[in-house]
Amino acid sequence: ATRFLSKENALYWIRRTVAENYQEIKNWIKQDVETYIELSISSELITGEGIAFHTDWKNIFSVHSVVVVLHRDRNNLFYVKTAYPIAGFDDVDDILDAMEEYDS
């Protein structure tokens, strides 16, 4: 489970994810096939925090990626269905180490 650090933090990462995926969004609207699209970005900056299954839940991990899901209506207007921070590639080692420590 993850969360953004604040409302302002969430809005920043949603806007940045949409901006960095602008061309993909344009292509999605043109294709008119799927009603939703899942976008993601990774960053060197902390995007949020979370806990991991099979670890001590008092251990909060910083995460460095974001997923934003957009939904489109019949008029090609879209809105953010959901957005959440996720563990990035570089976050996985810390989480796996904590899982190993917890299970031993």
Question: What does each model-identified segment do?
Answer:
Residues 1-104:
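Functional cores of ribonucleases/endoribonucleases
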